[in-house]
Amino acid sequence: MANVIKLRKGLDINLTGKASKDVAIPVVQAAEYALVPAAFEGVTPKVVVREGDHVNAGDALFVNKACPEVKFASPVSGQVTAIERGERRKVLCIKVKADAEQTSTDFGKKNVDALDGAAVKQALLEAGLFGYINQLPYAVSTTPDTTPKAIFVSALRDMPLAADFEVELEGNEQAFQTGLTALSKIAKTYLGVGVDQHSNALGEAKNVELNVFDGPCPAGNVGVQVNHIDPVNKGEVVWTVDPASVIFFGRLFLTGKVDLHKKVAIAGSEMKKAGYANVLVGTPLAAFVEAQLKTTSHVRLINGNPLTGVKTTMADYVGAHTSEITAIPEGDDCDEMLGWILPRTNQFSTSRSYLSWLFGKNKEYNLDARIKGGERHMIMSGEYDQVLPMDIFGEYLIKAIIAGDIDKQEQLGIYEISPEDFAVAEFVDSSKLELQKIVRQGLNILRKENA
């Protein structure tokens, strides 16, 4: 019997253009693919290939400089065409020109039921997939020398315009279960699902403890689920795994090969059709997004969802943890008479400033990317706590991070948060602070202090 956890705090933001599972987005065959190290938070990449080298799918393109046994696999076989670098020689991406006929390194099929935790770790390390596992504290890609007290997988994606994992799960049920079984060999594994998710592969998942979350966004955040099930204290570590990565792990054990195909949602009001595209990690966005845009001007293209995603361009690629590509109006061409004072029904407000609240919570809004105000002092108390379903004082924690008071941060629970946990709080924040950026900087400083 699943444990049902009801959450009252949070905020559902219904945006126009949610992806339909019945719409298949065509994908143009790309000549080049690229692996982007920035998708793996906390990893300093050390490139282990040279331009002109030939790699198979599954061969390492770079390793974690701090932990060289953690490799990162090429999504395709082909010739390494470029190692792009930015300021201070930061590695931006490694490009691979795909072969006409793809070849994969064979790591050998494995029966996960017969493996122990050490063997599972070793298999993931050899195949270049271990880096897809994140950890709390610090919300970074983990390393094999950490010993997790538990592993958390959240199959609930409830951010605005987020992809429905049940669409991606269809046809991958066996791989998903195999991945869960493999993780359960390392530590006790918790699977979090939503009250409206009815897939048998989720409801009848084996070798995991199933928890059903009933509440508004961000109930699907794995950090929120950790906070309600097994909070992280100083000195403790939990691993968190994206559900798409669980499928990658399962495929590895079932086939012996690295297969990084995933279904990515194409969503937002600026898309002609909102649906799902079957792509590889590293696929250029131009191969499947460009043809779907209504226009290329006054549009905010986002690698991810509007709350936690990153502003991007057609020159970017599908990231390791990307589950949706969204497009919303930029808002730089708007000219509104009387501004926010004008009564209206098409604007979203958490404080009932507009008449739109009369239409109920299910009304969809076509919001743009404007902040509508400048950064200012933190005067409104309690705003964060209304939408943060965690047993922490969010406002005081943010102030402690800004002040650089590490002792106070530890007392207020910084070890169990991720930047995405403050995404909804950032949306409602009348002070217009970049809360996710503040949290990330605080976690990075704390990680360096504790190294």
Give the residues covered by each predicted segment:
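Conserved "cap/hinge" positions at secondary-structure junctions
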Residues: 59, 64-66, 84
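Short histidine-centered loop motifs in beta-beta connectors
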Residues: 44-54, 58
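Short, solvent-exposed loop/turn positions at domain surfaces
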Residues: 43, 49, 66-69, 273
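Buried, small/hydrophobic-residue-enriched core segments of structured protein domains
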Residues: 70, 84-287, 291-451
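Generic structural signal for buried aliphatic residues
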Residues: 55, 61-62, 285
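N-terminal, Lys/Arg-enriched amphipathic/low-complexity engagement segments
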Residues: 1-48, 63, 213
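Short coil-to-beta-strand transition motifs
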Residues: 69-77
